[in-house]
UniProtKB/Swiss-Prot annotation:
Regulation (activators, inhibitors): Completely inhibited by HgCl(2), CuCl, CuCl(2) and AgNO(3). Partially inhibited by ZnCl(2) and SnCl(2). Almost completely inhibited by the reducing reagent DTT. Partially inhibited by phenylhydrazine. Moderately inhibited by phenanthroline and 8-hydroxyquinoline. Completely inhibited by the thiol-specific inhibitors N-ethylmaleimide and p-chloromercuribenzoate.
EC assignment: 3.5.1.91
CDD domains listed in its UniProt record: YtcJ_like
Self-association and partners: Homodimer.
Catalysis performed (reactions): N-benzylformamide + H2O = benzylamine + formate
Function: Hydrolyzes N-substituted formamides, but not amides. N-benzylformamide is the preferred substrate, while N-butylformamide is hydrolyzed at a much lower rate. Has very low activity towards allylformamide, N-(2-cyclohex-1-enylethyl)formamide and N-(alpha-methylbenzyl)formamide.
Obligatory cofactor(s): Zn(2+)
Propeptide residues, chain positions: 1-2
Pfam family of the protein (one): Amidohydro_3
Keywords: Hydrolase
Name this polypeptide is given: N-substituted formamide deformylase
MF (Gene Ontology): N-substituted formamide deformylase activity
Length: 542
């Protein structure tokens, strides 16, 4: 194997994101690791004679971004799916037209998936029915995935293939929407969409595993172009774990991928009594493919997250959960005893309390260094932040979703609920919580620049302010996309900051994300992306 040459990055504005937020002028990379961070003189004095020299002409260098909560295995199949994005599609007729046009070229009987549909963003403000989908996809089982990924809309062929009919009982954790006669309308909520999601995903993958690996690799290259050098897939099933194993074995993983393992389907009950489930979670890791963590969903998006509202001084509960409080407690405690790290999804304040109660029990019996993650906290009470901080919980937040979904979350919260805050990142930081920013892609953009901008600007797609008192600074946003998610992913000692001994996961940017104007932050461009000292992406002309 050819020995890697040392790399000197000089004439730079190096934002190390270390404990002191210190800056430097140069970095020496040797053997894929950061060797020296300091002045150009110090770096030149320690570099090998044949070292490569990269003069960045005053550009900013930061650690690679880490997206700790993403759904890469879902997003990878976008090129083979029907793009039903709303916007730019503005009416249901436009959505149906693009579906029909796509399906004309698909062999009969082959599954087709539609993506990025959001009913609240079209004129009709409704979902398509099975019969409308039958008309535009008459020869194929078709499944349109809601942009939230918590619902889907199927045609008759798809429903028939997975055995959903008038007499199908309601599944655990989900709902089959029915007409007055009891016949399914095609709308499937939460776990009811499991069979459709799994059947269509499995068909896409198993039809051609080699192509599936190439699609995954291509999506990872897209991520490199926006500066991602580490990603966590926040719902890995047995089949998507197989896809990752194949990609890793083929040398098609250009950065670290952490698997947060779920059940057999996207939303399905975790069963730690099954040896195959535990074996999958605890499967030996490779350098780039990591495991050892489990994802648990607590509350649902439909009818709404689990929220305790206050009306006339009395508490009212709205929303629904997948698990009861005792079930979450037992799952978390058992997982901890097995040595499994945890990432638990809690969107509303009631669900968050259930998660915190479970984590308090885990902390009583486990090592204080165990990483315990709360995913989302979309609608929370500011007082919950202090409890998170006391328990040492990592909050993985998604303020980028406020851009497209802000009005929906406001509706879910309810009127005159002053005790509830939307995406309360500022409050959580002030309480001492370690907060990471993450995309939840494909539910929202995967661009760290856009998500950091949303956290700083607190604006929706319509340009409306969304609780601007919860805004963070650009400096804080940078930490929340680098060192904090490194810790949440169990790799804080490996990466996330530019310090001697850490992996040389580095970005060269076209502007300083800390000092640029807020409006410019979302326009930030990555010029170069290095993973372990290897140049994995270079912007043309940079």
């Amino acid at each position: 194997m050819t020995q890697m040459r040392d790399l000197m990055i000089i004439n730079a504005n190096v934002r190390t994101v270390d404990a002191r937020n210190s800056c430097a002028q140069a970095v020496l990379v040797s053997g894929g690791r950061i060797a020296i961070v300091g002045t150009e003189t110090e770096v030149r004095g320690a570099a090998a004679p044949d070292a490569e020299v990269l003069d960045v002409s005053g550009k900013t260098v930061v650690p690679g971004f880490i997206d700790a909560h993403n759904h890469l295995s879902v997003a990878a199949f976008a090129p083979d799916s029907v793009d039903c994005s709303t916007p730019p599609l503005a009416t249901l007729d436009e959505v149906l037209e693009v579906i029909e046009r796509h399906c004309r070229n698909i062999p009969p009987g082959q599954w087709v998936r539609g993506i990025n549909f959001h009913a609240s963003h079209i004129r009709e403000q409704r979902n398509p029915t099975r019969y409308e989908l039958d008309e535009v996809a008459p020869n194929n089982p078709f499944f349109l995935i809601d942009a939230s990924c918590h619902a889907g809309f199927a045609n008759s062929a798809a429903l028939d293939l997975v055995g959903i009919g008038a007499h199908t009982p309601e599944p655990w954790g989900g709902e089959i929407e029915r007409d007055l006669s009891g016949k399914p309308t095609g709308t499937l909520l939460e776990a009811a969409a499991n069979l459709l999601h799994s059947a269509s995903w499995n068909d896409y993958a198993e039809r051609d595993w080699d192509r599936a690996v190439e699609l995954l690799h291509s999506k990872m290259n897209d991520y490199l172009a926006v500066g991602l050098t580490g990603v966590g897939d926040a719902m890995v099933t047995a089949k998507s774990a197989e896809l990752y194993r194949r990609a890793d074995a083929a040398g098609k993983m250009p950065f670290t991928l952490q698997q947060l393992h779920g059940g057999d389907h996207f939303f399905s009950m975790q069963d730690l009594g099954r040896s195959d489930t535990v074996d999958r979670i605890m499967e030996p890791e490779s350098y780039l493919l990591r495991g050892g963590a489990m994802k648990i969903f607590v509350d649902r998006a439909y009818p709404s997250p689990a929220i305790d509202q206050i009306h006339d001084g009395c508490k009212t509960h709205v929303g629904a959960n997948f698990y009861s409080k005792s079930e979450v407690h037992d799952l978390a405690v058992r997982a901890s005893k097995l040595g499994i790290n945890l990432a638990i999804h809690g969107m509303g304040n009631c669900a968050i309390d259930i998660v915190l109660d479970a984590y308090e029990a885990v902390r009583r019996q486990s090592n204080a260094d165990t990483v315990l993650r709360l995913e989302h906290a979309f609608i929370a009470e500011t007082g919950q932040g202090q409890r998170m901080a006391d328990l040492g919980i990592d909050l993985v937040a998604n303020p980028g979703l406020a851009f497209g979904w802000g009005e929906v979350f406001n509706m879910w919260r309810g009127e005159n609920q002053e005790h509830l805050k939307l995406f309360p990142v500022r409050s959580m930081l002030d309480a001492g919580v370690r907060v990471s920013l993450a995309s939840d892609h494909p539910c929202g953009t995967y661009s760290p620049a856009e998500i950091m901008w949303t956290a700083v600007a607190r604006e929706t797609m319509a340009g409306a302010p969304l609780e601007p008192d919860e805004a963070v600074t650009a400096d804080e946003a940078l930490r929340m996309y680098t060192i904090n998610p490194a810790h949440a992913s169990g790799r804080g000692s490996e990466e996330g900051s530019i310090e001697a001994g850490k992996r040389a996961n580095l970005l060269v940017l076209d502007r300083d994300p800390v000092d640029c104007a807020t409006g410019e932050l979302r326009e930030l461009q990555v010029l170069r992306t290095y993973v372990d000292g290897v140049l994995r992406y270079e912007r043309t002309g940079s």
